[in-house]
């Protein structure tokens, strides 16, 4: 990306995931391993009991994303502390879902006179994502990140008028292609790219060129 002239900033998600969890199996508490990756982090959590429990991630029912406000605050602070310019958000898996939430905030902020923080984001590249099931209050109604009722967020059902590129693989079993397609359908004129692989970001020339072409087209409109 840097060779194409784009500077990448890797922001760290605020929630540290535990390496082990305790679960109840037939009345007996058993310790399980959540993987070997140390410093694994999340933009939000699904359970107050077990921070590593992601069993609700693909449930297509409204829910509260625990700790989301901390992530929104982190992005807001970053944007406020940096100069105006061309910003794009890129996220993978849960990061792509967080990108969906940020896209909602971008479009909501456009309707608020004088609001110009999230509006710095001009486009989104969302890889292997799924639609957010967390309802947020619009900036002109309350602090972003607060939980709201469906009635107060009715206009959030409108398609998001933000340039977007949705990347996924038809062999993905962690976040099936259908979820990424549902996410893309929440945007106006989404662009899509199927890399044909599983739940991963392929490091190949074709994918990089597709992303750079998309970013170049968005930048040319500024």
Predicted stretch roles:
Residues 87-95, 99:
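Gly/Ala-rich beta-loop-alpha elbow adjacent to hydrolase catalytic centers
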Residues 1-88:
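Serine-hydrolase catalytic machinery in alpha/beta-hydrolase-like enzymes
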Residues 111-131:
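A conserved short beta-strand
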Residues 132-134, 170-175, 198-200:
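Acidic catalytic loop of the alpha/beta-hydrolase fold
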Residues 138-140, 176-185:
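Short alpha-helix in the alpha/beta-hydrolase fold that links the catalytic acid
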Residues 159-160, 165-168, 172:
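Short beta-strand/loop motif that positions the catalytic acidic residue
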Residues 189-222:
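C-terminal catalytic histidine-bearing segment of alpha/beta-hydrolase fold enzymes
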Residues 96-112, 124:
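Short glycine-enriched nucleophile-adjacent loop
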